[in-house]
Regions:
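N-terminal leader/linker segments that initiate helical-solenoid repeat arrays
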Residues: 5-59, 63
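Short helix-capping/linker turns of helical repeat alpha-solenoids
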Residues: 33, 40-41, 45, 54-56, ...
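Alpha-helix N-cap/N′ positions at the starts of helices
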Residues: 37-44, 48, 64, 80, ...
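Hydrophobic face of amphipathic alpha-helices that form TPR/SEL1-like repeat modules
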Residues: 47-54, 83-90, 113-123, 151-160
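Structural signature of tandem alpha-helical TPR/SEL1-like repeats
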Residues: 59-67, 90-100, 125-138
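Short, charge-rich amphipathic alpha-helical segments embedded
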Residues: 71-79, 83
């Protein structure tokens, strides 16, 4: 009797919609993403990282922020690279900050020059003024175009006399 019940339960589980859903999602997870899917995933990860960075709807958690920003950056998200660079400067890892900022710039995010200026200033290289100007211009353009992710950084730039 117990064997029959076990067989019925096993058959029900195999035929259940949940068992088909999990295997289908496993298959689709392995499938390559289209450029649009990649962009949407990168945006979602960036927003999640930004949320953890600034505590918009979640408790601030820099470790999780960096995790999600890094995942977005790995998908080619230039804004995520900027904020990773900023976090690396704050943690004192100037080499990593430079790599992130350079990658952001390569992807077209000229705000990365603002980070390069901060690095230059900390390393006493003396070329920070032009970088700050270019970075500030990019920050201001981003905010003027409606990207409020950069408004806090722009505010600090104004506060410290960069703009």
């Amino acid at each position: 009797m117990i064997d029959i019940i076990a067989l019925l339960i096993a058959t029900a589980v195999i035929d259940s919609p949940l068992s088909h859903t999990s295997s289908a999602s496993t298959i689709s997870a392995a499938a390559p993403m289209t450029p649009e899917q990649r962009l949407e995933k990168a945006k979602a990860l960036y927003e999640k990282g930004f949320d953890y960075e600034y505590g918009i709807t979640k408790t601030v958690d820099r470790t999780l922020a960096d995790k999600f920003l890094k995942e977005a950056a790995d998908l080619g998200h230039a804004d995520a690279l900027f904020f990773l660079a900023m976090n690396a400067v704050e943690s004192g890892d100037l080499e990593q900050a430079r790599a992130y900022a350079d990658s952001a710039i390569e992807l077209g995010n000229m705000a990365g020059k603002y980070i390069l200026a901060e690095i230059s200033e900390q390393e006493y290289l003396g070329d920070s003024e032009e970088l700050y100007k270019a970075g500030f211009k990019a920050l201001k353009e981003k905010v003027e175009q409606g990207d409020l992710h950069y408004s806090n950084v722009l505010g600090y730039a104004y506060r410290f006399g960069i703009g």
